[in-house]
Amino acid sequence: MAIASRRLKTAYSIWWVTFMNGKISRRSLMQTASVAAFAASPGDAATMPAPRFEGKDTPKIALAIGDGGSAQSDPVDPLRRIRQLGVEWVLSGGPPIPWDEARLKEQMDRVKAAGLNLGNLMITGFNNAIYGRPGRDEEIEKVIASVQAAGKVGLPVVEYNWYAHRATEGYFDEIDDVRTGVGWTSFDYELARGPGHQYMGAVREGEASIKFRDLPPLPNEGAHSLKEMWETITYFLKKVIPEAEKAGVRLALHPNDPPAPISRGSQQIMGSVDGWKHLIEIVKSPSNGITFDCGVTREMGENPVEVCTYFASRDRINHVHFRNVKVTKPYERYSEVMIDEGENNMFLVMKELVKHKYPREIYPEHPRALDYDRERGRIGGYPGGGGYASFAFQVGYARAMMQAALMSV
């Protein structure tokens, strides 16, 4: 038994040091782990520490309400499907503003009855505030009322976007031939939407041959500079964040995704890490935070671990999107791939979140298209996107990363 124990410790130490430094392939990891398992004995297992699981002070794996959605031929409660994966936290889009306390409580109670907790709602419906147009003060008051209602029912996080134009035009589907048909969601700033691919959104008349980078502003949006966008969000934050603090609610601004520098003539304030850093300095409060998306971070050519450290150490990560990408050209050409095969070391990202005691939701979003979901009509509403089967893989992978991180920090 002592010899077996020494073998296990040696194999485990080699594996752990190598893995922690991000220098091990999946095949090598499995081979080394197999050696360690072979070396173990029942006596050794009795002395090994028990795994740690999600708790009050740890990150929480979450899915969106609807991620467990089923086809009409199989009408299983989607919340039940989510709970079956071991997920205890969910997020969702919010109702029209202003939010009503009674309606929010009803939604939270419905989720609670399914054994789940609602941790994040997306708030929308304030374009005049984003563009600095007449009516923005009325919209901001509706946002404040919504945040106050969220605080009264115990909703911890309200997420939002600040796009002049939310690009869909540059996305298309690609197929992973090595992984025999897995769907990727790819983005190309130089894309003109010709035949041969699935695209996101309808092609507007006369635009099929125009590259995304050259598309003109839409009449209802116009073109907006960085200066304009910073002015409007500063005005918004200085009114909303003090009220969010009083309500005990954290706001999480999602980065611009895609982070292309110009989106239909408008610049993007959340299209760079410098922009993210500037945002949290406008109002210095934990209620003024970001959605840390390690996929977008890599799309911009940045190191997600370093960026995570910067914001987590300042307690400004209020929500997390956990996904992987392969980048051809930062900002302009990349593919969203399976969570276990991109350029991000997902374990090191998770470890950094655990190290800084991040306690809120982690959403392993953007599942890849698998045949199982395709055959059942359960695929995402975007090119290359998948459904429940792929979410099950993402959740299992993210939870494994979390348990390993909790054991290592």
Q: What are these regions, as identified by a protein language model?
A:
Residues 50-74:
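Boundary/entry segment of secreted carbohydrate-active catalytic domains
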Residues 1-24:
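N-terminal secretory signal peptides
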Residues 62-66, 93, 119-122, 159-161, ...:
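A cross-family glycoside hydrolase active-site/sugar-binding cleft signature
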Residues 67-69, 96, 124-127, 162-166, ...:
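Active-site-proximal loop/turn and secondary-structure-junction residues that shape catalytic pockets
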Residues 76-93, 153:
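Catalytic domains of carbohydrate-active enzymes, especially glycoside hydrolases
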Residues 21-58, 78, 129-132, 151-156, ...:
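Histidine-acidic metal/acid-base catalytic patches
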Residues 93-234, 246, 296, 354, ...:
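Structural motif corresponding to the early beta-alpha repeats
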Residues 69-82, 139-147, 303-309:
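Short, acidic/polar
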